Structures are given as structure tokens and as C-alpha cells.
Curated annotation (Swiss-Prot):
Consequence of gene loss (knockout): Mutant mice develop normally, including the immune system. After injection of the chemotherapy drug cisplatin, they look more healthy and vigorous than wild type.
Region annotation (Membrane targeting domain) ranges: 1-56
Organism taxonomic ancestry: Eukaryota, Metazoa, Chordata, Craniata, Vertebrata
Tissue expression pattern: Expressed in spleen, kidney, large and small intestine, testicle, stomach and by CD4(+)CD(8+) T cells in thymus. Expressed by macrophages.
Gene Ontology biological process terms in this record: cellular response to tumor necrosis factor; cellular response to virus; inner ear auditory receptor cell differentiation; negative regulation of cell population proliferation; positive regulation of immune response to tumor cell; positive regulation of intrinsic apoptotic signaling pathway; positive regulation of MAPK cascade; programmed cell death
Domain commentary: Intramolecular interactions between N- and C-terminal domains may be important for autoinhibition in the absence of activation signal. The intrinsic pyroptosis-inducing activity is carried by the N-terminal domain, that is released upon cleavage by CASP3 or granzyme B (GZMB).
Keyword Signal: no
Sites of S-(2-succinyl)cysteine modification: C45, C156, C168, C180, C235, C411, C420
Gene from which this protein is expressed: Gsdme
Official protein name in the record: Gasdermin-E
A GO molecular function held by the record: phosphatidylinositol-4,5-bisphosphate binding
């Protein structure tokens, strides 16, 4: 809840900026100015960097010398208040991007979210540089040695943080609906934050977390470039990147690099930057289609029973955000060859049922578990299959809030293959014809409404006309359309045979 609330806050006040949201409330006390933070570089363009707060400061890892005494500037940051629409009946409407979508909505109530007045503390960077000018990094420091073992992490120093000034409560509101004649139920979650003026908290069954005043909800860092002899530089300019000077280039994955290089997405722009489309709004989809057919080939050659089992586990994961985050962390650590405390903690927080699903998924994609739970003693028996699964999971984990719920609903409705066909057709000229037999399931108004909401979460606005649909990109970025294309392609590869059987069965019984 806390992670989602802080993430939503930054989307509104610092979209595309340099601030980082705090993911765990327990990390708030660790976030002191000049604390060390590691930034884990990711492999694919849509993956956001991961950050870990270390139990050390910059002073702790420097050689002896003049003690760092940072000059701290404190100021008002912003008074954060946000209004959103919640629907008070079972049927849900939703507002995504610039498009308002309603499927049987029966009234809207306006809710209010607020962290209240926020304060910013910031280090005087120029003074810090002067104080550290003759200092070097102690490369024998235990903390530094552990960071170097990770091979693809950047050492950073915390230079600013954003804090609350009053007590807040974070609540989660679950909205439910039944659609398509009761065939499926959809539950979407919204996070609401309320600041309390006098310190009192109103009891509410939806309140799940209370955060005190002076809680850090976001922070800013500055990367360091550390040379082999311990000399280091502060990376002040936008294009200047930190890291460690190595005698030889190290691969960013621990497993067979060839298993990962088959995924042809390494030369695209960083996930935080927009990819402008000049040759059509869904040009990136057309570019990626052939690559994805090759990338998901290991799924295509699996035995039908294994395909179906993997697809069934994935359906559970799509409706369980906590399980998806834990699975992505585990896959990330397996690929990196070094288990992190985040993976261990994520698995410990899972229920027995969630752990069973996580274990089942890993075993189905070529991961051999030696003990009771996944751990560093395990090994990957089929690297291409595991790389393919990690590729899909990484894309699912980067989908916006509630998008995986809509995707899971489409799996239940057996329309994944239709959605792939729809996306391909739209990538040609932004318009598709519903006379195409593969698109027949989408002629249903309620099914199309769910598809609209899924596509809107990927910044694609679908407009339905009498016998066709038209697509418009909502933002000048192709990252979310690319992620949607990857997830649909992976799920379609696993479910295609099953959906074809259902389609043939439907025709045999005279159903549409």
C-alpha cells in the first residue's frame, strides 16, 4: 500500500523527474542525507532501475581525512492534494489517461487524497564536493566488496529527501463488478491517502496503514563513478552515469548470456524516456512482432500439458500483485546470480498458497529447487526456457496499476489470441475491421469494454465504430504499448492451442 501511494504521488508531482519513491515504510528511517544507495541496472528497456538503501553513509566508505559536514537546506516542497473518482456501485467506470471509460457505471463519488504539506531537505552539493575533494573510496570496505559482487550495481549517495509534516493514513478501496453475463468478476484497487490536521485518525475498515509525521516518502540521489584506485567522481550532468571501473566488461546476467541476447530489445531507448513514433502510433508493435515470435519459441515447443499448466499458474499471478512482485524479484536474482535480501523478504511475506504458486511456476520453466523453498543452492536446468519466462514476468511486473487484472480477465474470457490479432491489425493503419473472424469475440460490447480498459492502461485509446475500432496513442511514448505487446504475445503462445480447442467446441455446438 505504502509503495503504491508514494509511486502515485510521484506520478503526479514529479513525472519524468529524478525523485525515487520509497517502497517500504521501514526504509524511511534509513534514508538519511549522505546515506549510500545502490542502483541496480536492468537488462531490458522497459525495466525501471531497482534501488537498495545500504546501512552505511558516504563517510563510512571513504579513507581517513577531513570529516564530511554537509550543509543542509530545508524548504517547503509542495502541499499535495489529489482528487479522483470512485464509483459507488458494483459496476465500474475508470479514468485512464485522457479517456473516461464506463461499463455500466451507476454513479460517481469524488474522493480526496492528501499527504498534506511536504518538506524537502537537500544537501549543498558544491560544498559536499569541496569537502570530499581529497578523499578516496576504501575499496577494501566490506560494504563496497558486497556491492562489487553484484557486478551491475551503481553506488549512489542520497542528496535530498521529501518528508511529511503530519500524520497520514493510507487506505485501499476494492471495487468489484461482474460482467459478460456473470462469466467473470473484476476487482480493481485504488489507494487513498488522508492527512490528519489534529493527529486523530477516523476508524475505517479500509484503513490498512498509518504513517507518522516526518516520514520520508521520496528521495533523490547522485551517482558515483568509482575508479579501481578508489578515486571517485560525482555524476552531476544528465548524461553522466556512475559505476565501477572494471578491467573487463561484465555481463549483466549471470546465466548464459546467449540465452538472453536472443531477446532483441537491447538497443531501444531507456525505459524512462519516450520513444516517439513518426510512422504510425503503434509502429513499435510492428517492429517487435518478428522478434517476439522468435523470443517466445521456447514456450511454443513445450508439451501441451506443460503449456496449459504454465498458463494456469500465470492466470493466478495476474490477479495477485504481491505474488507477481515476489516472482519478478526472484527471477531477477536468479538471472543476476546473487540472491538479495529483497527476494528473501518478498518470499517470506507470501502465504503458503502464494509460495506454492511461485514454486510451481519456477519448476515449470526449468528451475530446479533443491530445498523446501527457492534459494541460492538451486540451479537452472533449461536456460532458454527460464530466460523466456523472466522476459515475460519482467514485462508483467512493469504494467501499470490494475492492468494485470484486466489482462487476467481477458485470459478468463479466452480472447488473448483475438487481442494479439487486434494489436497487429491496429499497428498497420491504426484501424481494424471486426469482420475478421479472429476478432469476432470482440464484437460483444462488454468484452470490448474490458479490452478498452486494458489498452487504456497501456496508453492506447480504443474507439469503437460500427464494424471497426480505431487506436490512438495517449502519450508520446511506446514503452507501455511495447509491454502490452510482449505480455499478449507470451500469453497467446501458451494459450493458443487451448483457445483454438474452445473455439472449435463453440462452433460445434452452434455458439458464437
Amino acid at each position: 500500500m505504502f509503495a503504491k501511494a508514494t509511486r502515485n504521488f510521484l506520478k503526479e508531482v514529479d513525472a519524468g523527474g529524478d525523485l525515487i519513491s520509497v517502497s517500504h515504510l521501514n526504509d524511511s528511517d534509513k534514508l538519511q542525507l549522505l546515506s549510500l544507495v545502490t542502483k541496480k541496472k536492468r537488462y531490458w528497456c522497459w525495466q525501471r532501475p531497482k534501488y537498495q538503501i545500504l546501512s552505511a553513509t558516504l563517510e563510512d566508505v571513504l579513507t581517513e581525512g577531513h570529516c564530511l559536514s554537509p550543509v543542509v537546506v530545508e524548504s517547503d516542497f509542495v502541499k499535495y492534494e489529489s482528487k479522483c473518482e470512485n464509483h459507488k456501485s458494483g459496476a465500474i467506470g475508470t479514468v485512464v489517461g485522457k479517456v473516461k471509460l464506463n461499463v455500466g457505471g451507476k454513479g460517481v463519488v469524488e474522493s480526496h487524497s492528501s499527504f498534506g504539506t511536504l518538506r524537502k531537505q537537500e544537501v549543498d552539493v558544491q560544498q559536499l564536493i569541496q569537502d570530499a575533494v581529497k578523499r578516496t573510496v576504501n575499496m577494501d570496505n566490506l560494504v563496497l566488496q558486497q556491492v562489487l559482487e553484484s557486478r551491475n550495481e551503481v553506488l549512489c549517495v542520497l542528496t535530498q529527501k521529501i518528508m511529511t509534516t503530519q500524520k497520514c493514513v493510507i487506505s485501499e478501496h476494492v471495487q468489484s463488478e461482474e460482467t459478460c453475463g456473470g462469466m467473470v468478476g473484476i476487482q480493481t484497487k485504488t489507494i487513498q491517502v488522508s492527512a490528519t490536521e489534529d493527529g486523530t485518525v477516523t476508524t475505517d475498515t479500509n484503513v490498512v496503514l498509518e504513517i507518522p509525521a516526518a516520514t520520508t516518502i521520496a528521495y533523490g540521489i547522485m551517482e558515483l563513478f568509482v575508479k579501481q584506485d578508489g578515486q571517485f567522481e560525482f555524476c552531476l550532468l544528465q548524461g553522466k552515469h556512475g559505476g565501477f571501473e572494471h578491467e573487463r566488461k561484465l555481463d549483466s546476467v549471470y546465466l548464459d548470456p546467449l540465452a538472453y541476447r536472443e531477446f532483441a530489445f537491447l538497443d531501444m531507448l531507456d525505459g524512462g524516456q519516450g520513444i516517439s513514433s513518426q510512422d504510425g502510433p503503434l509502429r513499435v508493435v510492428k517492429q517487435a512482432t518478428l522478434h517476439l515470435e522468435r523470443s517466445f519459441h521456447p514456450f511454443a515447443v513445450l508439451p501441451a500439458q506443460q503449456q496449459r499448466a504454465l498458463f494456469c499458474v500465470l492466470q493466478k499471478i495476474l490477479f495477485d500483485e504481491e505474488l507477481l512482485r515476489a516472482l519478478e524479484q526472484v527471477c531477477d536474482d536468479v538471472a543476476g546470480g546473487l540472491w538479495s535480501s529483497q527476494a528473501v523478504l518478498a518470499m517470506e511475506e507470501l502465504t503458503d498458497s502464494q509460495q506454492q504458486d511461485l514454486t510451481a511456476f519456477l519448476q515449470l520453466v526449468g528451475y530446479r529447487i533443491q530445498g523446501e523453498h527457492p534459494g541460492p543452492q538451486d540451479e537452472v536446468s533449461n536456460q532458454k526456457l527460464f530466460a523466456t519466462a523472466y522476459f515475460l514476468v519482467s514485462a508483467l511486473a512493469e504494467m501499470p496499476d490494475n492492468a494485470t487484472v484486466f489482462l487476467g480477465t481477458c485470459c478468463k474470457l479466452h480472447v488473448i489470441s483475438s487481442l494479439c490479432c487486434l494489436l497487429h491489425a491496429l499497428s498497420d493503419d491504426s484501424v481494424c475491421d471486426f469482420h475478421n473472424p479472429t476478432l469476432a469475440p470482440l464484437r460483444d460490447t462488454e468484452r470490448f469494454g474490458i479490452v478498452q480498459r486494458l489498452f487504456a492502461s497501456a496508453d492506447i485509446a480504443l474507439e469503437r465504430m460500427q464494424f471497426s475500432a480505431k487506436a490512438t496513442i495517449l502519450k508520446d511514448s511506446c514503452i507501455f504499448p511495447l509491454i502490452l505487446h510482449i505480455t499478449l504475445s507470451g500469453l497467446s503462445t501458451l494459450s493458443k492451442e487451448h483457445e483454438e480447442e474452445l473455439c472449435q467446441s463453440g462452433h460445434a455446438t452452434g455458439q458464437d
